[in-house]
Amino acid sequence: MLQQAERILQEVLDAFDFGGQVAGVLRYGQGHINDTFCVYVQQADGDAKRSILQRINTDTFRDPAGLMENIVGVTEYLRRVIQEKGGDPERETLTVIRTKKGEAFFTDSTGGAWRAYHFVKDTVCLQQVQTPEQFYQSAWAFGNFQRLLADYPAHTLHETIPKFHDTRDRYKKFEKALEADVCGRAVEVQAEIRFVREHQADCAVLMDLLESGKLPLRVTHNDTKLNNVLLDKKTGCGLCVIDL
């Protein structure tokens, strides 16, 4: 099993253009959905160039091609906007590393889907907030992400997990799960169940506004947590939104 995993990893490393000979690979980060690795490439000056390699969880994201088309579209748009505003697109948004065949992701011989990004240097990714300012900076980064993408043609994005944001559908599934009560735990959370049912109408508000045209379709991140923002190591300022 270990030999097969090493063979697949080597197959993946050979597929991407990391800009040199790979010197090492280590598991990286504390993500729960995708498997993340840091790839080290030795450079002529002795420094090690780093890249991020991820195996996409295709049980969660069953359309990796659509997912990566979304990410490439959004990040390339962000690069243009950031540059126009005098920013540094190499640090302020993700940069997709393409395969040697020019593709945005690679499918290995077992069907696994892989993607790679440039490593954003001189940043920190916090798992736990230490100061109110850090929370502010993470919120600022997500707000800036939304602002920069305000004019992005959101209708061109693929819905990679169908009805994931459809709160009316979520409520229907809640009622089905409640009726099935497969673990027999509903009796322990009657107050919470009552609260949700009392607010059933709220579940339709955003979807109704969207369908009526009163709420414009926009790009959203939808996993706006502290460890999905890179902070500048020197200034502590919110720099780059990740895990798109």
Q: What residue ranges belong to the model's regions?
A:
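Catalytic-loop signature of eukaryotic-like protein kinases
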Residues: N227-L230
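ATP-binding pocket architecture of kinase catalytic cores
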Residues: A44-V72, E76-T156
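Juxta-kinase regulatory segment immediately upstream of eukaryotic protein kinase catalytic domains
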Residues: M1-L26, V74, L78
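ATP-dependent phospho-/nucleotidyl transfer catalytic cores
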Residues: M1-Q3, G19, L26-Q30, Q54-A65, ...
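ATP-binding glycine-rich phosphate-binding loop
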Residues: F18-A44
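Active-site beta-strand-loop-beta-strand hairpin of nuclease catalytic cores
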Residues: Y40-R50, T235-G238
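Conserved active-site aspartate in kinases
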Residues: D243
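Hydrophobic HxD+1 residue recognition
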Residues: T224
